[in-house]
Amino acid sequence: METNIKTVHYLGSKARMLPVIKEYVDELNSVNGKVCDLFCGSGVVSEFLLQQYDILAVDIQNYSSVYCKARLTGGIPGIDIKQIESEIRNLPIRKKNLDYYKALLRYENKCMKDLVDGYLEPMYEIIEKGSLYAYLGKYDYIEGAMSSELEEAFTDVKNRIGTEAESVDSAVTRYYGGLYFSFKQAIDIDAIAAYAFLQDEPLKSCLLYTSPSPRDA
């Protein structure tokens, strides 16, 4: 399994300084004792030092805990990636969201085809005005009118999701679909997250760690 996966790019990342950091740690830790990585963030320093030292990675942020559990566990023996992918694809939550959002998915697919043909405006509108969260909340977030095609797709989704407009099952799709990810990608990310929270560690953290976040888009 690929282990060199970068899912977050920190401002001030220490990734390029790892050999120098290790030199100083070696100098200060001549007895080869345990190393505590305070404010470990994405865990790149802990992962690098783990080659030689016993590491205690510490951070107050929960996302950091997820990253480090995934990076520092050393992999999961016997994992069947194809089976996991199949289970995620067939997850009831994913099928439900594909049904709820099908009008929007059709329209987005049409816009992508237009983009390939050199017609940029429809896709540009999705990126600029395609916030389903803002549409459902009736927030005044756009300049000018929304096209009838996009509004019809949004209206169809609104009617389909009904009382599930705030469901955690589609949180990524509502907040980030269209703006950061395509709506299809966002639905898949929601499915991966839902599947991950059904798993035990370390698989849970590994799945969450490898899921894209808006800052990676």
Please report, for each region that a protein language model flagged, where it lies by residue:
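Nucleotide donor/acceptor-binding cores
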Residues: G33
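Structural motif
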Residues: A196-C206
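Single conserved hydrophobic/aromatic residue that forms the stacking wall/gate
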Residues: Y209-A217
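Conserved Class I S-adenosyl-L-methionine-dependent methyltransferase catalytic core
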Residues: R174-Y175, L179-F183, I189, S205-L208
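SAM cofactor-binding core of SAM-dependent methyltransferases
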Residues: C36, S42-I88, P92, G162, ...
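S-adenosyl-L-methionine
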Residues: M1-N29
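Conserved phosphoryl-transfer catalytic core
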Residues: R71-A145, G162-E164, V168, Y175
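Mobile cap/lid helix-loop segments that border enzyme active or cofactor-binding sites
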Residues: D188-A194
